[in-house]
Design a protein with these regions (language model features):
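N-terminal secretory signal peptides that target proteins for export/translocation
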Residues: 1-10
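Bacterial N-terminal signal peptides
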Residues: 13-24
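Sec/Tat signal peptide C-region and signal peptidase I cleavage site
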Residues: 24, 28-30
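Acidic, serine/threonine-rich low-complexity disordered tracts
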Residues: 30-101, 143-229
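Short, compositionally biased low-complexity segments
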Residues: 102-109
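Surface-exposed beta-loop interaction hotspot
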Residues: 109-148
Length: 229
């Protein structure tokens, strides 16, 4: 005797649809990718910048391609950096992580092994400044002091940032926009010898421009501009 046909539950029919909707609801929306043009003298290249948010932290991934170079940092929403990684193939993959008033660096940097601890104080660690300076630009705070890692040497340096008001700036592709300006300098006696400037879009804090010199007198100025506004 042939078995009677199985009776199909209405739930079985809609189960795939329910699961699909559940996965769509759980998935985070794709983080927007911003493109920037960096120019130093006659040299220029484009890099990408992406901010991925999680529940109570912000993970900022900056992908910069001049050859093969990648920056990845894990920050609090207030801009403080908890961990950072810098990869430049084939000989650099270095990680930094904060533990109290110490930052441990490990990995390889330009072919040499790195395993060291640098002592700081209770000032925040900012990396990258294109994200970490955003609260200063938007919240009306006048100044802040912080630590940051020099990418070319892995040295931790103390810096000072000052809000410098708002102004309209030209964009590479698009109309003028209102931007909040932040000026950074080395903390202490060297503060009068070097400075750089950041601009953040007034409406949402997105980094839109940088201007500074990376070298001795006579070095061409470096300008970074948002391409996708």
């Amino acid at each position: 005797m042939n078995p009677s046909p199985a009776r199909h539950s209405p739930f079985q029919a809609i189960l795939p649809l329910c699961l699909a909707l559940l996965f769509m609801a759980a998935a985070s929306p794709a983080a927007p990718v911003f493109r920037y043009l960096e120019q130093t003298g006659t040299d220029s290249f484009i890099f990408t910048w992406r901010l991925e948010r999680e529940r109570d932290t912000a993970t900022l991934s900056v992908v910069q391609r001049q050859g093969s170079e990648t920056f990845l940092s894990r920050n609090t929403p207030a801009g403080d950096t908890l961990a950072w990684q810098y990869v430049h193939q084939p000989d650099t993959d270095v990680r930094a992580e904060r533990d109290g008033d110490r930052i441990r660096l490990s990995g390889r940097f330009r072919g040499r092994k790195v395993d060291e601890v640098q002592t700081i104080d209770d000032r925040p660690w900012f990396q990258p400044l294109s994200f970490s300076l955003r609260p200063l630009a938007l919240n009306g705070q006048a100044t802040t002091e912080f630590w940051t890692i020099r990418v070319d040497t892995l040295e931790l340096v103390a810096m000072r940032a000052e809000a410098a008001g708002r102004e309209e700036i030209h964009t590479v592709r698009g109309p003028r926009l209102a931007a909040a300006k932040v000026v950074i300098r080395p903390d202490g006696l060297l503060g009068g010898l070097w400075r750089a400037e950041y601009w953040f879009r007034a409406e949402d804090g997105q980094f839109v421009r940088y201007r500074g010199t990376h070298g001795p007198p006579g070095t061409p100025e470096t300008v970074i501009s948002l391409l996708d506004s």
